[in-house]
Regions:
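Acidic helix-start/capping segments at beta-turn-to-alpha-helix junctions
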Residues: 93-111
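Solvent-exposed, acidic/flexible segments
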Residues: 66-76, 124, 165
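Acidic/histidine-rich, surface-exposed loop or edge segments in extracytoplasmic proteins
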Residues: 52-70, 112-115
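Structural recognition of the beta-strand scaffold that forms the well-ordered cores
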Residues: 58-62, 99-103, 140-143
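Histidine-anchored nucleotide/phosphate-binding helix
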Residues: 73-92
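Positively charged n-region of N-terminal signal peptides that target proteins for export
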Residues: 1-5
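A cross-taxonomic marker for long C-terminal extensions/tails that follow the last structured domain
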Residues: 22-25, 29-36, 40, 117-118, ...
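Bacterial N-terminal signal peptides
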Residues: 6-16
């Protein structure tokens, strides 16, 4: 019996040492490997269901939430950054990510250029640096043209880096027909 107890203790000790060795250093707990400063993620090298780096991934994100305060980045947009970071951290090259993020509903205002955002909300648009970083990583950031009209924004107020789509409804269904997967955020 003493031999079994010693064996169990040794196995538990060895597994706890392995678990500690796999953890990143305290300063590296959160990382943003592709979209610097946004979409933080925690590396899990031994995790299940990791994406295959050889495949191409097509996702259309439906962005419907602005920040709780006008000076906060949209949590939906930040989740797009997290998704990019998760795929890149798993070894998938940016060239294998075909991502489109379309804003509508409450998220429509996140795509306004800085002067019009400031006029509407009283602060600079905190989403523009993230939109620029996403565009740089190959993500097409778009806005529902119908939502722009519903919010009584002018189309010229939309930041020049953002694609004005006919609608979120047609963008999503058109891209789904082309093999994209919908991720509502």
């Amino acid at each position: 019996m003493r031999g079994i107890t010693s064996l169990i203790a040794a196995v538990l000790l060895a597994s706890s040492i392995t678990a500690v060795a796999d953890e990143p250093a305290a300063g590296d707990f959160w990382t943003t490997p592709a979209i610097a400063g946004y979409g933080r993620m925690h590396p899990l090298p031994q995790a299940a269901y990791k994406p295959d780096p050889a495949r191409t991934y097509r996702i259309v994100f439906s962005l419907t939430k602005a920040g709780q305060k006008p000076d906060e980045v949209s949590p939906s947009l930040d989740r797009v950054a997290r998704t990019v970071n998760l795929y890149v951290a798993s070894g998938v090259p940016l060239s294998h990510l075909k991502f489109v993020a379309v804003a509508s509903g409450d998220a429509t205002g996140i795509v306004l250029d800085d002067s019009h955002y400031k006029a509407a909300f009283g602060v600079s648009n905190p989403n523009l640096p993230l939109i620029a970083a996403l565009r740089h990583a190959g993500v097409d950031v778009a806005v529902c043209g119908q939502a722009v009209a519903e919010h009584k924004f002018e189309y010229e107020w939309v930041d020049s880096s953002v694609t004005v789509a006919l609608s979120a409804l047609t963008t999503i269904t058109t891209l789904e027909e082309r093999g994209y997967h919908l991720m509502p955020l």
